[in-house]
Amino acid sequence: MASEKDAGKQSAVKLVPLLITVAVGLIIWFIPAPSGLEPKAWHLFAIFVATIIGFISKPLPMGAIAIFALAVTALTGTLSIEDTLSGFGNKTIWLIVIAFFISRGFIKTGLGARISYVFVQKFGKKTLGLSYSLLFSDLILSPAIPSNTARAGGIIFPIIRSLSETFGSSPANGTERKIGAFLLKTGFQGNLITSAMFLTAMAANPLIAKLAHDVAGVDLTWTSWAIAAIVPGLVSLIITPLVIYKLYPPEIKETPDAAKIATEKLKEMGPFKKSELSMVIVFLLVLVLWIFGGSFNIDATTTALIGLAVLLLSQVLTWDDIKKEQGAWDTLTWFAALVMLANFLNELGMVSWFSNAMKSSVSGFSWIVAFIILIVVYYYSHYFFASATAHISAMYSAFLAVVVAAGAPPLLAALSLAFISNLFGSTTHYGSGAAPVFFGAGYIPQGKWWSIGFILSIVHIIVWLVIGGLWWKVLGIW
């Protein structure tokens, strides 16, 4: 009986956040539409804002909030039921969902862990070297695992936790600073960088690509994204552990046993399994098609479908695995709602209206100054978001429109905001899916997490806008 009551409490609606969400939506709804904007666009904006607030305050799970938003959109006649459900037929959504399924193969077969242990075995003799081995393990995995939460939480975090405890570093006995705190903070921050480096390294990156095309007419392909990100990304991966090593140094500087631990783990895993070989083949197939498929008119979502079909055919994944992948189905629901809302806000003129309104506010500045101001505002506004996807859905289109309207080259603006959309999770312990996993281990106090995150945010902005800017100049992006 007690357990049933506890379960009921856990699943209960949070009344105060729900009332706030509904109240904000109603207030915006009944405010007269601004001049130059259709009432229908304003009403959809009210639903959109309420949805974002619901995602942040979480009176219900995100999927449930999305269903509520869909119901209100259709019931009020703001959009037809066909338009309301149009997001579920979006190929970008299905690329994300299918990629979730493929990432399950890395975890289920143990291939992801094996790759990481090999890196530790080769490069993990010192604590700093160990941190680099973990980051570059993440880098290798990132193009094929679009859920940075699955990549960091399902592969990198367990390895760090195991290594930390092996070296006697645990918050339970007050030894978290030995090695665990440093590795966890470095692993988390590195995950954000690798997420920024590839179109397929974070679930919302394909959404960004779609918004960039819809708003600015920019096509962000897998290859163009990776080439633009490679230099600032690698520089960030090199600098970040050094900064954390200086700000929050580990007590253990040498880790001669790390390679031995990795070797033992690899022995426990045994020889390369048939399922792992199948996973490698699919990984390479998908990666090659994501890079070169455009030359053969093979869409990225088609590539993902091919990869999933092969995994099912080879029984690396079963249909039960697919059904049990709750994160994928949850993502399908709330991503579909967000994409639909964002699409029709653009179609109904909301984004262009906001762009024109904001353009006047930065009209006195050169495009470079306006560009920097808007990038910084976009980055630090993430303190108010508990989800990168929610932030991207709420602000990416509008900020891109304003930056382009101010005179910035569209490709430069789209890419810069895209990269920042991954990096801004560095600031808090709730700003990305992986953050609660790493912070929740208890190795790093909140104040230290935030202070290091803020310093690293400055480092990220400098690296990506200055070093990245020079690289993009070489590439002819601006």
From Swiss-Prot:
Similarity field: Belongs to the SLC13A/DASS transporter (TC 2.A.47) family. DIT1 subfamily.
Role this protein plays: Might be a malate transporter.
Lineage: Bacteria, Bacillati, Bacillota, Bacilli, Bacillales
Species name: Bacillus subtilis (strain 168)
KW Metal-binding (keyword) present: no
Induction of its expression: Expression is induced by the two-component regulatory system MalK/MalR in response to malate. The regulator MalR binds to the promoter region of yflS.
Name of this protein: Putative malate transporter YflS
Transmembrane regions listed in the UniProt entry: 12-31, 41-57, 64-81, 96-118, 187-209, 222-244, 277-296, 300-319, 332-354, 364-386, 398-420, 450-472
Location within or outside the cell: Cell membrane
Entry keyword Transport: yes
Keywords, sorted A to Z: Cell membrane, Membrane, Transmembrane, Transmembrane helix, Transport
Primary gene name: yflS
Predominant place of localization: membrane
Topology of this chain in the membrane: Multi-pass membrane protein
Top-level taxon in the UniProt lineage: Bacteria
GO cellular component, one term: plasma membrane
GO molecular function, one term: transmembrane transporter activity
InterPro entries: CitT-rel, SLC13A/DASS
